[in-house]
Amino acid sequence: MFDDRPQHWMPDVISWNKYFGWYVGAIDDFGGWLDMMHKKHPDTRIGVSEYGVGANTQDHSLNPRQPNPGGQFHPEEYQNLYHEKHWREIERHPFLYATAVWVAFDFSSDGRNEGKNPGVNDKGLVTQDRKIKKDAYYFYKANWNSAPMVYISSRRFTQRTEANCEVKIYSNCESIALLVNGKNYTTIDSSDHVFRCADIMLQPGANTILATARKNGQTFSDSCTWNLSLPK
């Protein structure tokens, strides 16, 4: 709200903490804000010193909507969507001199009571105890790390009540072979390290999801199990 205070534009460079889609506005506002600030101040180097949203690895949603930051439901899938879209905008705006994900690890924050974790800021890509790397961690790994990898997102969303779902995979390989319950389902290509396959039909009971890729003559794979229990 204070973007255009004159004193902010005295230095040669400036960075902002911006939380579009969390504390203010919507996720898709981020790109427009970058365009606006660069148009107004083309000679000032602009950075983003913080961006991120909270996620509890036990909270999940097929169609995540923007949560209440101070509420108790912080689905991992919304954090995934947020970082996918923000990183896409960061790549699209080369005038940014620096950006920083907020934050690497969940951390103590005494005044908070949100995301089912009292006293914790849950914007980390890794849980506070360092034991669980959230899905968004692997999104950035697919984008930033050259070591071949395949990772099925929403893997902790194990208990399903809807048969029709999407499988989304993060990988730095060129194509992914998707198998569902041992049967070849499809081969997916992607140019942005996010591989999607919609309208997957789960069967009642346990469903094995297997994603496989080839790179440099080697095979890389990941798997998870989703259990479907249809409402009676």
Enumerate the language-model features and the residues they cover.
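Substrate-binding clefts and catalytic carboxylate motifs of secreted carbohydrate-active enzymes
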Residues: D4-P11, S15-K232
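Short, surface-exposed recognition loops and adjoining beta-strand edges that mediate ligand/DNA contacts
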Residues: M1
